Amino acid sequence: MTRRKLLPILRHIVSRPTAPFHEQAVAEAILGFLKELPHVKVRGDKHGNIIARYERLGPGGSPVQPRYAFAAHMDHPGWVRVDDQVLGPSVQFPGAKHPMQFLGWVPEACLQNPAVRGYGRFAMWDLPEFQLRDGLIHARACDDLIGCAVIVSMFIDLEDSAAEGACLGLFTRAEEVGLVGAIKLASSGLIPDDITIISLETSSERPPAKIGDGPILRVGDKSSIFDSAATLSLAQIAAESHIPVQRCLMPGGSCEATAYQLAGYRSAGLCVALGNYHNCGPENRIAPEYVSFSDVHGLVSLCASIAISRTKKNEAVKSLKKRLKLNAEKYKKLLKTKP
């Protein structure tokens, strides 16, 4: 996909207002794109999560089973009216009829005297919705609307290129309050047991990760380490596709790969490095999040390559095992010498 085609997709989805349990505008934007794609079928679960399936039959019209599911969440930390429940700090904004509680994590200092914009039963920080400046996307909610837009863009890219194969896109709710949507979706029985689920995120920039150095092969998060075989496979596909990637832990937070992995799914992670995580700028000032447009473009290309990859399951593991075994054989005679 060209950058020129990618930009309006990003702008349309990332600009939508959202908060935990109030993801409707983002869901509508996603569905608006997907309904135009003849080879993408969409269904939802009873909790409002969205499951999209791309499938274009192979030679002879034989069915194709999806090997990968790409997952992203549709919410972002925000102020929410939750009647008769106290789920977080509560604030009565000027002119508002009801107090609102903040759902999602930010330092307590960032919650003092916030400037917000209301959307009925929820509110977001009063920040620019989407701007592209000097190669960086500055937005009110990169996390994780960028991930949602990447999946949509991947589907469009697969459709435009008439790619044969199948994959899933998972768009979930209420990640910011403890991976709630992903946990419910993982137990729904709607995702094939043998699929590899790849969590797509924007993750707080921490060394050695660097904004602008390409998409990141995320080996784990704050809570867990992801599947080694799946991670090796993604690294192999990236190399074969000539897409430069960074390889980092990214421990700034926990992502949905942890939830799916705990449910028994083989899970992996991809992300782009994020500035001003959860809108927390210098000196606890609220500020737009930002990511590299080039990193996002690279992530779309990588996801499309993964979706149609013919790399066999565990092929990368077998290759590594063979390489190490041959190397050990090379030095076998030296082991006979006394240390």
Please report, for each region that a protein language model flagged, where it lies by residue.
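N-terminal hydrophobic/helix-forming segments and targeting peptides
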Residues: 1-339
